[in-house]
């Protein structure tokens, strides 16, 4: 028993109890244990990992059915995984990517599909430039303080896209961009929140790219190893199948009760679960009004992650890498990536069923989803081999009661400016982690590590172990996965938008017409 503790009425006394055994909670517990803090992790599921989950069987060896991707500028998760001896490998984009739109397949290379229509090109260019420029106005640690926060928080991303885009081509791709990045619909999410989300991931190119972007790499053996290995380090300080139902901090010691009626005491609590899931916990005293309102207003995104396995990577015979961007309302999958193992074994394509499509297709039998996906791949890749998979894995995150969805919680219009400032505010001796509370790569594993370690340092500060100025720590860049600067050409920076072009051409036409009239007027009359 440390000098922090008073006699326990439960016999289970700890300095800190962490609620949630995902990457965020376990990163917090690991850091606390390194300071010799007596910590316990309570995890609701019968496994650790949270929204990361590595399935292992003879058909797949291992497969990440949850969070999997990591890339440059995600320095905390790269540092943590390296410390645990987990290596990364690059997602294959050596061959051509594919865009499928209006029933046709268009191969391309690079982060974004090329656009041949001049007006659509101007529209695309202006869309990405405008989103990035708006994002630069938003403080990553306090988006509610942005100069236009109130204005942007009142509208949805659909409203903003419809305002920015003049062509149907750019508008529909922008809708898909929202679906892919936050597994939600453009009409559901606040423009302020989405612009902040893209900004804190490094901008439109960084968040969407494979090479030099958020999807550049995966972990050899699966991302689930991160949580599993931290659990091994913590030993018996991680308890599974222990959903927390009650927290009482009215006395010197906080009392925690689980669903199976086990009781624990501690001095501090770190909640490392999605905000909406804290509504499953009874608090005494009750949560402050703003916190209580916030947790009721942050829905989770909707996604089904699907992996189709084949005898061989047949798509490579056509010089395709396996990445498909699919713009088709009837298509189950919106985006894919090659999910073949780094040694070339277990050829597979990973695809996401996103947002409205996840809700719709979840009603079908698994075999029907599998068939629809294979038929889609056959059509997009132009190969009947897609119809003959050897195995299929999927994970519907909407049915996970201890996640509520994936990838992350989103802010509907009006919520960020009204309640966003309390997302990280402690409630008494309860501190908040979880990827939603991060300021860099929120929604990703990187954000989970940032949030967990920051919450741990907040507790360490309360315990007198670290100074207040050391709660927020700047992470050095990974030497193994350095980030390349994202640059834009002179034309990309300076090309006009479609309305800008119309103004220019309209003015030019008017001047030419005026000159013609003046010329005619000055001619001698016969």
From Swiss-Prot:
Residues bearing PTM S-8alpha-FAD cysteine: 406
Domain of life: Eukaryota
Keyword Oxidoreductase: yes
Gene Ontology biological process terms from the UniProt entry: dopamine catabolic process; positive regulation of signal transduction
Catalytic activity, EC: 1.4.3.21, 1.4.3.4
Assembly behavior: Monomer, homo- or heterodimer (containing two subunits of similar size). Each subunit contains a covalently bound flavin. Enzymatically active as monomer.
Protein's name in the database: Amine oxidase [flavin-containing] A
Lineage: Eukaryota, Metazoa, Chordata, Craniata, Vertebrata
């Amino acid at each position: 028993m440390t000098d922090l503790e008073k006699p326990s009425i439960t016999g289970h006394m700890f300095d800190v109890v962490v609620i949630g055994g995902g990457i965020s909670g376990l990163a917090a517990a690991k850091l606390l244990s390194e300071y010799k803090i007596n910590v316990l992790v309570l995890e609701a599921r019968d496994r650790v990992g949270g929204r990361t989950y590595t399935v292992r069987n003879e058909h797949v060896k291992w497969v990440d059915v949850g969070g999997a991707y990591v890339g440059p500028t995600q320095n905390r998760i790269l540092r943590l995984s390296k410390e645990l001896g987990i290596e990364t490998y690059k997602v294959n984009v050596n061959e051509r990517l594919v865009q499928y739109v209006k029933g046709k397949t268009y191969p391309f290379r690079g982060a974004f599909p090329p656009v041949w229509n001049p007006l659509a090109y101007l529209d695309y260019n202006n869309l990405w430039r405008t989103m990035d420029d708006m994002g630069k106005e938003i403080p990553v640690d306090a988006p509610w303080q942005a100069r236009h926060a109130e204005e942007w928080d009142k509208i949805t991303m659909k409203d903003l896209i419809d305002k920015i885009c003049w062509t149907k081509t750019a508008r529909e791709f922008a809708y898909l961009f929202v679906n892919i990045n936050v597994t939600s619909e453009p009409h559901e999410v606040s423009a302020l929140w989405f612009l902040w989300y893209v900004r804190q991931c490094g901008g439109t190119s960084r968040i969407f790219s494979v090479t030099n972007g958020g999807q550049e790499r995966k972990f050899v053996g699966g991302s689930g190893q991160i949580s599993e290995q931290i659990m091994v380090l913590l030993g018996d300080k991680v308890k599974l199948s222990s959903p927390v139902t009650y927290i009482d901090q009215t006395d010197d010691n906080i009392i925690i009760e689980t669903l199976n009626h086990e009781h624990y005491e501690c001095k501090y609590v770190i909640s490392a679960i999605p905000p909406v899931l804290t509504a499953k916990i009874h608090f005494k005293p009750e949560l402050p009004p703003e916190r209580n309102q916030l947790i009721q207003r942050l829905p989770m995104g909707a996604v089904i992650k699907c992996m189709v396995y084949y005898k061989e990577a047949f798509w490579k015979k056509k010089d395709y890498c396996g990445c498909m961007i699919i713009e088709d309302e009837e298509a189950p999958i919106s985006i894919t990536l090659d999910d073949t193992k780094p040694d070339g074994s277990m050829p597979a394509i990973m695809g996401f069923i996103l947002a409205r499509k996840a809700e719709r297709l979840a009603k079908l039998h698994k075999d029907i989803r599998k068939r629809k996906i294979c038929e889609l791949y056959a059509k997009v890749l132009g190969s009947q081999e897609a119809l003959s998979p050897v195995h299929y894995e999927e994970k519907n995150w909407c049915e996970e009661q201890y996640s509520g969805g994936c990838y992350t919680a989103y802010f509907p219009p009006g919520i960020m400016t009204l309640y966003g400032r309390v997302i990280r505010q402690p409630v008494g001796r309860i501190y908040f982690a979880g990827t939603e509370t991060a300021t860099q790569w929120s929604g990703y594993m990187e954000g989970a590590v940032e949030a967990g370690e920051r919450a741990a340092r907040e507790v360490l500060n309360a315990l007198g172990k670290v100074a207040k100025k050391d709660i927020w720590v700047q992470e050095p860049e990974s030497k193994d996965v350095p980030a390349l600067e994202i640059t834009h050409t002179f034309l990309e920076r300076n090309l006009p938008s479609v309305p800008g072009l119309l103004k220019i051409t309209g003015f030019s036409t008017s001047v030419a017409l005026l000159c013609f009239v003046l010329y005619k007027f000055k001619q001698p009359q016969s």
